[in-house]
């Protein structure tokens, strides 16, 4: 492998991994689990637990159901980690919890003094936790990545430290200098044996989708769309199937189901949105397996590329402007599209869905995921049939890289204010 192939692969794999539950509350749970190794007293004796998070962690942790608990809340996520989590499980930190452990965590949440707040001047991903006892205080900080614990302190003494500032800056510099054409070249030249994780993600996310159709809840979007399809209210085709199964996977995940999904860019919903549309079009048209694998890898890479400019979390829905873009690009490439058609598919997505607000992780994310997945399919086939936006109209610039920068500017300079208003609404 060349340096560039390896660098891109390492960056993608860092944010593409199995996760159980929404990754924002899971990040809080993971930090609690990491702090376990440094807490010598029974957590039930804690006098106060302070959980300080970024605006986006707060927003995404407020209303999404934590797997196997039937309830929501970053306070519960923190206690789950502190009371029984194992840091070695990473984003699967909840997989080994049984009913007794969950019941105890719920009791501790009610009994302990847990203070939750958010800090407006932090990175997108930021969790700081202080566990205070009569004669000790344990503090942990996680930031810039869902499992990136930067330090653990006991009584202000640093016992663990892992700062990634330099490597993080190098990664951002590498990604920001890429183009869609260059990313495609690297995707196509990477040895196929290095992409085993792609098939693992397909299996995982399709399983979540199929299980989502079996959930016992008549109000779920995937099941509702499936019933409408069966009644011939909506069409029975690849576009509709994509919307149904993407929604079903989101239903499973957002309602606290016990299915792992493969993330993309650190997000499970975005992993669903990259993988399922590309895989279903591959099935529908009986395409080559290798082309599907590389298309999904391309989708992950485009998702991560956009996030270099928009941020890992923002006030704009990442499934619309990043993961959906990746799906559209991947489908177009897989169908034999030219570089111009791939850019056109991405421009279609931006012209259509830029500005879709992120109002936090919750059950209704299924609606947005379903829309973004369907529009990714539509955008790809429109581009393949010669229908793309004119240049320099609205957010769409003269080339796709500048369009991505335009949307990134909107995320950083305008939608941070949208986030503030949204937090006022949902608090």
Predicted regions and their residues:
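Flexible, glycine/charged-enriched surface loops at secondary-structure junctions
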Residues: 42-48, 89-94, 115-117, 192-199, ...
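A structural signal for small-residue-enriched, beta-sheet-centric alpha/beta enzyme cores
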Residues: 20-23, 55-57, 144-147, 152-154, ...
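Membrane-embedded translocation segments of transport machinery
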Residues: 232-236, 240, 253-281, 285-287
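Alpha-helical support elements that line or immediately flank enzyme active sites
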Residues: 25-41, 271-287, 328-336
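Conserved phosphate/anionic-ligand binding catalytic regions in large, soluble enzymes, centered on
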Residues: 18-34, 259-276, 318-322
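N-terminal alpha-helical transmembrane segments of multi-pass membrane transport
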Residues: 1-22, 26, 40-49, 53-63
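A structural-propensity feature for long, helix-poor, extended segments
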Residues: 45-89, 102-113, 291-341, 345, ...
